[in-house]
C-alpha cells in the first residue's frame, strides 16, 4: 500500500479544519472523483472531494477525502453512508485527523496468514489494538484466493507497535505456522532488501502453494526455494518515483506482453510490460521487463514467480540491475 494517506493529510490538514473532513475507505476501484463528490453531496454541501490516486500509475488507491462546509453534515454522512455497499465493496466513512508524528509509519505488513482468512477476519484479529484506517489482503485475481499476505494501516504508530509485539511469531487460528507482523517497508529505506530476503525464505513461502491460473493455458509449478536465494544479493535499480522494474529471463520464443500481464497483474499495479524481440523474426529473445508501482507487491511477485515453469521454461525473475539486459 502507498503512503498516500500521510502525504495527502500533510497537504490538506495543516490547519485545524474541525469535524468536517472525512476519510472514505474501501471505495470501488472504478469509482471516479465526481462520483465520490456526488454521493456525499446527497447529504449536504461539499466543499471539496478528493479521490487518492497512485502518483505513478494514476489508478485509484481505494480511498478519498470529503470535506463538508457544515460539521453536522459530516456527522450525518458518517451515520448514513458508513457501511454502505457499493458494487463488491462496503465503504468505511470516518473523521480524518490532521497529520502528526503519532500517525506516521503506522502501516503493517503481515505474511504467513492462513489462505482461508478474509479481509474481515484479518481486521477482526487486529481491531483490538486500535482504529484501523484501511486494510488490504493480497488476492490472486485469477483464482480469487488469498495469497496469505495483508497490509493494515493503524490510526497511530503506537497501535501498530502493540500489534507487532502481540502477533509477530503468533499462530493464528487455522494455521500451523507463525505469522510475520512488521512495519511495511518504505521503498526509500535501505531495509527493502532485507524485506525481500525475508519474503523469499519465509516459512509461508516454503509451504505456500504455487499460483495457478486454472482457466488459462499457463500453469506455474514451484521449484526449490533455494533457487530464489540469488534475488537477495542483487542491487535494486529503481526508485519509488519511476516504479520498480522487474527482469524476467528465460521466456519462450512465443512469449508476449499478454503473458506478462497475466503473470504479474494478480500481484498488484503494473504500469508497463515489455518483451524484448528479435528485430528480424519478431520472436521473443528470451527476456522481458515489468514495472510495478509498489515495492512490496513487486517483491512478492518475484518471490512467487522466480523459479516457476512457464511451458517448458524455468523462469528467472529478479529486480532489474545495471547488469540486466537492456
Curated annotation (Swiss-Prot):
**Start and end of every RRM domain?**
20-98, 106-186, 244-322
* Cysteine disulfide links: none
Domain of life where this protein originates: Eukaryota
| Keyword flag Cytoplasm | yes
User: What processes in GO biological process is this protein linked to?
Assistant: 3'-UTR-mediated mRNA stabilization; gastrulation; intracellular mRNA localization; mRNA stabilization; regulation of stem cell population maintenance
- Any GO MF annotation of the entry: mRNA 3'-UTR binding
Query: Can the keyword Repeat be found in this entry's annotation?
Result: yes
Which is a Gene Ontology cellular component entry for this protein? Answer: nucleus
> Keyword set for this entry?
Cytoplasm, Developmental protein, Gastrulation, Repeat, RNA-binding
Q: What is its main location?
A: cytoplasm
Annotated InterPro entries: ELAD_HU_SF, Hud_Sxl_RNA, HuR_RRM2, Nucleotide-bd_a/b_plait_sf, RBD_domain_sf, RRM_dom
List where this protein forms a coiled coil.
none
A Pfam family the protein falls into: RRM_1
Subcellular localization(s) per the UniProt record: Cytoplasm; Cytoplasm, Cell cortex
Q: How does it assemble?
A: Interacts (via RRM3) with cirbp. Unable to form oligomers. Part of a ribonucleoprotein (RNP) complex, at least composed of elavl1/elrA and/or elavl2/elrB, igf2bp3/vg1RBP, ddx6/Xp54, ybx2/frgy2, lsm14b/rap55b and, in a subset of RNP complexes, stau1/staufen.
Any idea what job this protein has?
RNA-binding protein that binds to the 3'-UTR region of mRNAs and increases their stability. Involved in embryonic stem cells (ESCs) differentiation: preferentially binds mRNAs that are not methylated by N6-methyladenosine (m6A), stabilizing them, promoting ESCs differentiation. Binds to poly-U elements and AU-rich elements (AREs) in the 3'-UTR of target mRNAs. Acts cooperatively with cribp to stabilize AU-rich sequence (ARE)-containing mRNAs. May play a role during gastrulation. Required for the vegetal localization of vg1 mRNA.
Protein family according to the UniProt entry = Belongs to the RRM elav family.
What is the name listed in the Swiss-Prot or TrEMBL entry for this protein? Answer: ELAV-like protein 1-B
Amino acid at each position: 500500500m502507498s503512503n498516500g494517506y500521510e502525504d495527502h493529510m500533510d497537504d490538506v490538514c495543516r490547519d485545524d479544519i474541525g469535524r468536517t473532513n472525512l476519510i472514505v475507505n474501501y471505495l470501488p476501484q472504478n469509482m471516479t472523483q465526481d462520483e465520490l463528490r456526488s454521493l456525499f453531496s446527497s447529504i449536504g454541501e461539499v466543499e471539496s472531494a478528493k479521490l487518492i490516486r497512485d502518483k505513478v500509475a494514476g489508478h485509484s488507491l481505494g480511498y478519498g477525502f470529503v470535506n463538508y462546509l457544515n460539521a453536522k453534515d459530516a456527522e450525518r454522512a458518517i451515520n448514513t453512508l458508513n457501511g454502505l455497499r457499493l458494487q463488491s465493496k462496503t465503504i468505511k466513512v470516518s473523521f480524518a485527523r490532521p497529520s502528526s508524528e503519532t500517525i506516521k509509519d503506522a502501516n503493517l505488513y503481515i505474511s504467513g496468514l492462513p489462505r482461508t482468512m478474509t479481509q474481515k477476519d484479518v481486521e477482526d484479529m487486529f481491531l483490538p489494538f486500535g482504529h484501523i484506517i484501511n486494510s488490504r489482503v493480497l488476492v490472486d485475481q485469477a483464482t480469487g484466493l488469498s495469497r496469505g499476505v495483508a497490509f493494515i494501516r493503524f490510526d497511530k504508530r503506537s497501535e501498530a507497535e502493540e500489534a507487532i509485539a502481540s502477533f509477530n511469531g503468533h499462530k493464528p487460528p487455522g494455521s500451523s505456522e507463525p505469522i510475520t507482523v512488521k512495519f511495511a517497508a518504505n521503498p526509500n529505506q535501505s531495509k527493502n532488501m532485507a524485506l525481500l530476503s525475508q519474503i523469499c525464505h519465509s516459512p509461508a513461502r516454503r509451504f505456500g502453494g504455487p499460483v495457478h491460473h486454472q482457466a488459462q493455458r499457463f500453469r506455474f509449478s514451484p521449484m526449490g526455494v533455494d533457487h530464489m536465494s540469488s534475488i537477495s544479493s542483487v542491487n535494486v535499480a529503481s526508485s519509488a518515483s519511476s516504479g520498480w522494474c522487474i527482469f524476467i529471463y528465460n521466456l519462450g520464443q512465443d512469449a508476449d506482453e499478454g503473458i506478462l500481464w497475466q503473470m504479474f497483474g494478480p500481484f498488484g499495479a503494473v504500469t508497463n510490460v515489455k518483451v524484448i524481440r528479435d528485430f528480424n523474426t519478431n520472436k521473443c529473445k528470451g527476456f522481458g521487463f515489468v514495472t510495478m508501482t509498489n515495492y512490496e507487491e513487486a517483491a512478492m511477485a518475484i518471490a512467487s514467480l522466480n523459479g516457476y515453469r512457464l511451458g517448458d521454461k524455468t523462469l528467472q525473475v529478479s529486480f532489474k540491475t545495471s547488469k540486466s539486459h537492456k
